[in-house]
Amino acid sequence: SFDAAHFLTNYEGKCKNIHGHRWRVVVTIKGELTNGMLVDFGDFKKDIKDLCDYFDHSFIVEKGSLHKKLFDLLNKQFVLRVVEFRTTAENFSKYIFEEMSKKYSVKEVCVYETPNNCARYVCE
């Protein structure tokens, strides 16, 4: 999991304002067992942790969503993480699926932005 702030562009609800979540990430992998094992869970957990740590305690910003002057001012004092997608749980689940799929055979990724609300990206 990671704690981070974001806001939604092109949205008129309360999430258009900067707010934060404790994002929880669940990655499910699939594959054939080799010697009774799918993967080394130590390596797998480290890779998920590294991905989450990149975003932890940052302000996640969709590329181009902030005026350049504001972006430059914020970037001097805070950790900004710029992503190519709108910062929804749905898009985060797809992004994490794609990143983890570079090394693992991922079946699905669930990203929770609250304890009860999650978005799931599933391999088709």
Tell where the protein language model's regions lie, with residue ranges.
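Charge-rich, low-complexity N-terminal segments
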Residues: S1-E124
